[in-house]
């Protein structure tokens, strides 16, 4: 996802699906496959920039950040509602303000549907788009089906249509490690 200086926010989504026969963890947690980052960098070479300040708000076990570091040398700030490793700061993304701190927000977010009392995926995407620096990018690993729905159209795509969408032709599984 990109946000230009005219405050016209648009985004790019890298689609993936989870049809793994392996067990899934609680908290809507899927361990990302590190190959997902390599595929993203092939399409989005601007990520190879050590000066980028990158946030991973749904870090899980840090698979995406570890893979990005191996390939580019870029480090990410890691947050998750459940801390699964020492360098992940345990926090609820919705309870912290990250406005204008990051050039890139990159994550495989939980796919939960929100409610009146609990924010969901659409709310999370809107928060990321509003918080990324002007000229920054939001990169999400999502199932293609998340492009659908009237709610997401009204909350996100109507005013912030996707800039680029990359879809895997071969599945990369996300699973319990």
Feature-to-residue mapping (PLM):
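Class I S-adenosyl-L-methionine-dependent methyltransferase catalytic core
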Residues: 1-177
């Amino acid at each position: 996802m990109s946000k230009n200086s005219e405050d016209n926010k648009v985004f790019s989504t890298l689609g993936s699906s989870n049809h793994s026969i392996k067990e899934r963890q609680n908290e809507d947690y899927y361990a990302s496959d590190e190959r997902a980052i390599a595929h993203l960098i092939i399409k989005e070479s601007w990520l190879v920039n050590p000066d980028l300040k990158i946030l991973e708000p749904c870090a899980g076990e840090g698979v995406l950040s570890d893979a990005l570091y191996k390939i580019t040398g870029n480090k990410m700030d890691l947050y998750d509602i459940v801390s699964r490793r020492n360098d992940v700061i345990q926090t609820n993304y919705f309870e912290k303000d990250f406005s204008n701190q990051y050039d890139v927000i990159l994550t495989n977010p939980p796919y939960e549907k929100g409610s009146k009392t609990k924010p969901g995926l659409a709310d999370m995407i809107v928060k990321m788009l509003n918080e990324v620096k002007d000229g920054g990018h939001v990169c999400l690993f999502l199932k293609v089906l998340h492009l659908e729905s009237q709610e997401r159209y009204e909350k996100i795509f109507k005013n912030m249509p996707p800039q680029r969408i990359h879809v895997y032709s071969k599945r990369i599984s996300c699973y319990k490690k």
